[in-house]
């Protein structure tokens, strides 16, 4: 399993994502967004464990939950930005 961090425009969207991942059986934790990741938005995101990003994003799309950015969290502490959803 890989660990991804997804940022959202509002805490409500982040909370909806947390519930959707729970329903899908994926491990997920609501967290404060690190300050360097904040661009615009609420300052909250979700850390989710899933086999790949596609699996994680399918849950959000099925529930119609837009996200701002996605990141892969490496075991060594590194972070890799993967993509955007919202303009």
Predicted feature residues:
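Amphipathic, hydrophobic secondary-structure cores in small proteins
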Residues: 2-12, 17-22, 26-57
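C-terminal structural segments of small proteins and small subunits
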Residues: 54-87
């Amino acid at each position: 399993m890989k660990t991804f961090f997804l940022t959202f425009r509002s805490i409500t969207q982040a909370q909806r994502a947390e519930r959707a991942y729970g329903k899908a059986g994926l491990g997920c934790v609501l967290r404060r967004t690190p300050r360097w990741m904040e661009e615009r938005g609420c300052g909250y995101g979700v850390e989710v464990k899933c086999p790949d990003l596609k699996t994680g994003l399918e849950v959000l799309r099925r529930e119609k939950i837009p996200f701002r950015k996605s990141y892969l969290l490496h075991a060594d502490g590194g972070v890799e930005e993967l993509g955007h959803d919202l303009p």
